């Protein structure tokens, strides 16, 4: 089922997500919904908080840019945690489904190790590098209440200030309208 994206300005994006204690049908359905939503929105990664669910859950589907015949690297990570990273960073342009049309360069580690649970509840360790490592860091940040704009340098934030303010104001106005409709319905 398609889910609605949470957009910048919504306070949920700044909250730390809760650890998933039990992998049940509800979590498995959530994973499927996240993949469906991510594909529809043409993303390569999605954290549960981006659809309003404050659970430590991330899905990714990353193409192999060197071999278009290869299938995408597709993975659901439950309770993901970066347990190691190298010291080398690379700055590449990032965007985010929760920040429509806003992009900028973000420095990320080029190699990481991620501990997570798979769909069956088995603990896994993933060695990731380059683009996959970048996508994972971006999505795991979301589970910790961190958005890619929090990783920007101050000069980058100043450059994007107007666009971010407009996006936040539009989101806040939309949330207020929904809340007002809910209050009217319940009175």
UniProtKB/Swiss-Prot annotation:
A Pfam entry, by short name: Pep_deformylase
Top-level EC class as recorded in UniProt: hydrolase
Catalytic-site annotation from UniProt: 139
CDD domains: Pep_deformylase
Reactions listed under catalytic activity: N-terminal N-formyl-L-methionyl-[peptide] + H2O = N-terminal L-methionyl-[peptide] + formate
GO terms (BP aspect): co-translational protein modification; translation
InterPro entries the record matches: Peptide_deformylase, Peptide_deformylase_sf
Keyword Glycoprotein: no
UniProt EC number: 3.5.1.88
A single GO molecular function term of this UniProt record: peptide deformylase activity
Record bears the keyword Metal-binding: yes
Required co-factors: Fe(2+)
Cofactor comment text: Binds 1 Fe(2+) ion.
Annotated binding of Fe cation, by residue: 96, 138, 142
Keyword terms, alphabetized: Hydrolase, Iron, Metal-binding, Protein biosynthesis
Function: Removes the formyl group from the N-terminal Met of newly synthesized proteins. Requires at least a dipeptide for an efficient rate of reaction. N-terminal L-methionine is a prerequisite for activity but the enzyme has broad specificity at other positions.
NCBIfam families hit by this protein: pept_deformyl (TIGR00079), PRK00150.1-3 (NF001159)
Similarity comment text for this entry: Belongs to the polypeptide deformylase family.
Designated name of the protein: Peptide deformylase
Annotated source species: Brachyspira hyodysenteriae (strain ATCC 49526 / WA1)
């Amino acid at each position: 089922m398609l889910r609605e994206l949470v957009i910048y300005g919504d306070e949920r994006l700044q909250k730390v997500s809760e650890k998933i204690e039990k992998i049940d049908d509800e979590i498995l359905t959530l994973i499927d919904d996240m993949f469906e939503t991510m594909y529809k929105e043409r993303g390569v990664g999605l954290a549960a908080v981006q659809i309003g669910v404050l659970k430590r859950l991330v899905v990714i589907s990353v193409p192999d840019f060197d071999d278009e015949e290869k299938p995408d690297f597709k993975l659901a990570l439950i309770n993901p945690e970066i347990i190691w990273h190298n010291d080398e960073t690379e700055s590449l342009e990032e965007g985010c489904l929760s920040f429509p049309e806003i992009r900028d360069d973000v420095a990320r580690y080029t190699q990481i190790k991620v501990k997570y649970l798979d769909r069956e509840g088995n603990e896994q360790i993933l060695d990731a590098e380059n683009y996959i490592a970048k996508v994972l860091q971006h999505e795991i940040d979301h589970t910790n209440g961190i958005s890619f704009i929090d990783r920007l340098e101050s000069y980058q934030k100043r450059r994007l200030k107007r666009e971010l303010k407009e996006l936040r104001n539009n989101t806040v106005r939309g949330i207020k309208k929904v809340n007002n409709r809910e209050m009217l319905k319940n009175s």
